[in-house]
Amino acid sequence: TAWDYYAFIRRVNLMLGRIDSSQMTEAEKAHWKSVGYFFRSYRYFSLLSAYGGVPWIDRVLSDNDTELINGPRASRDEIAKHILEDLQYAEQHINVNGDGNNTINRAVVQAFISRFCLFEGTWRKYHGLNDAETYLKECKRVSAEVMNSFPEICSNYDDLFCSLELKDVPGVILYREFSNAENVIHATSIGGTTGASYYNPTRDLVDSYLCSDGKTRWNSPLYKGDKDMYDEFSCRDHRLWLQVTPPYRIDRSASTDAWGNKWQFTEVAKDRSFIDSLNIRLGIGYGSAKERQKTLPFRQGYDGGILGAVPHFDFYLENQPWYKSAFGYNNWKYYCTYLSMGSQRNEETDMPLFRVEEVMLNYAEAMCELGEFDQSVADRTVNKLRSRANVAPMKVAEINDSFDPKRDLGNPAYPGDYAVNPLLWEIRRERRIEL
């Protein structure tokens, strides 16, 4: 549970309590205090988001500290204030470049301040609490600095989630490194590949992706309808094709059983249309061992089973009881050629923890909440992401009450519920799609 974080917080407090008595220089002491403050704040943010006010413990407790051990929790105001103060100290005192590659540095701290302050600022605004603007303005400040430090974004969205190394990928601020050789592995893609199919995208998620003209599926002339998945996925934000497995059908007749891996394209052009689109439009290969590419879904952790077709419904399995879905949509975000049949879930692709795209969207949302979002902000944030995804740029002047007929208009049955501002709705859509 989130309460287990206090064991980690105690370890951080042990380190912080002994830094001043060390033989380090004052600058080194300040740096390592900053690292400790970052990690303690990271855990306290999880506690704050789960519980609101919680006990604030900033030193190692003894058995005699009964007032703290048995005392009431601190208020949300106090916890949020401590988190921000610690992170602001860290921002000013941590080594600019950290302690080497992929370590906690100033940009990482600023990215975390951006994330925390947007959360806390909007929570306070929509729950009628004080100081919302303080946190939103701080989000605006640090986000702008991070964006200046990371002016480029990765040109290929898929590379962010399907790369063996994120070290040199533009816009990645901090990532979790994995390696089979070091026995540090993960199984991110496995949830959508087993017979259980633990999680699947929903229709609501698919509907939220814009058409390539920048309009919603509800009012774009490019939308071809949803009676056929090939039509549904046509002329859409390319990130949809990389999040949800696009439709295809292959010829598996050369495979003698469900586990066979022999396949070829059918003679029907439609069956391979999205395979070809991925290759031509996105520079992503499909089905052979090359850099930067997706791979056909297969039963990972076993000896094979290339999936013959998508959509693949759990009530129409075609003798292949895995990678199924009740909705017809499957996760594909982390599928790549670095996965292998029989791998027993030994995945070693790196995972981004902080990247500039999130910070850009934090900035956009904070600016909107502060009433400062305009076309120049859209061009600096949302539209940089859309250009990578083959979506027309956001034109702020065109976003009105009718832009998305499915926008949340609130429910009068619930006191205090409200209609979401159309512009804010579109910024939140971009966050949902990008992240």
Predicted feature descriptions by range:
Residues 1, 88-89, 106-110, 115-304:
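An aromatic- and glycine-enriched ligand-binding surface/loop that stacks and positions planar moieties
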Residues 1-51, 67-81, 85-101, 227-229, ...:
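Conserved, well-structured interaction surfaces
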Residues 238, 242-385:
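C-terminal substrate/ligand-recognition segments
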